[in-house]
Amino acid sequence: QSKGEMSTGTELQTDTEYQDQNADSSIVQSLVAEDESNKAQPGDQLKVYLTFDDGPSSNTAAILDTLAQYNVKATFFVVGKEDEESQEMYKRIVNEGHTLGMHSYSHKYSVIYDSLENFEDDFTKIQNYLYDITGEDCHYYRFPGGSSNQVSNTDMKEFIKYLNDQDVTYFD
């Protein structure tokens, strides 16, 4: 199987990273077992969820313009950026009806995942920061590096329990 091809049937897809050298993001295709239970059935309403991580970035305004052109909504998992342009992007995401999700304030794995206390501090900072700017009480979180990352010094179950206790849904 070459880069960019998708498997069919009950084959197992392996991790492949797709990186656009001119972009500030990458897509990792994780292990996915495909079987009949996760395939669309005739008559199903098909859905696609668009999510964007690590923003706002230099591409966010263009992404929002394109989404508006096609009347499409997306979820933006953002990090804490204090510059005026980023603050305007947070507001624009919300004002245009998209979902604003948290992706940590600092995005510094070595700090966030060092302890539950550090994770809680970073989480509280991004949640309060986004609320102060947008008035939105964010309830969605995407772990930097994913919920099964290899850099955490703390059992990820502790972080997940904390998010559950905060009524926050996490997504990978």
Predicted regions and their residues:
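Short, well-ordered secondary-structure micro-motifs
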Residues: 112-113, 151-154
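Charged helix-capping and loop-helix junction motifs
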Residues: 119-123, 153-160
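Low-complexity, acidic Ser/Thr/Pro-rich repeat tracts that form intrinsically disordered stalk/linker regions
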Residues: 8-26, 30
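Active-site beta->alpha N-cap acidic-glycine motif
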Residues: 22-143
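Short, internal active-site loops enriched in acidic
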Residues: 145-150
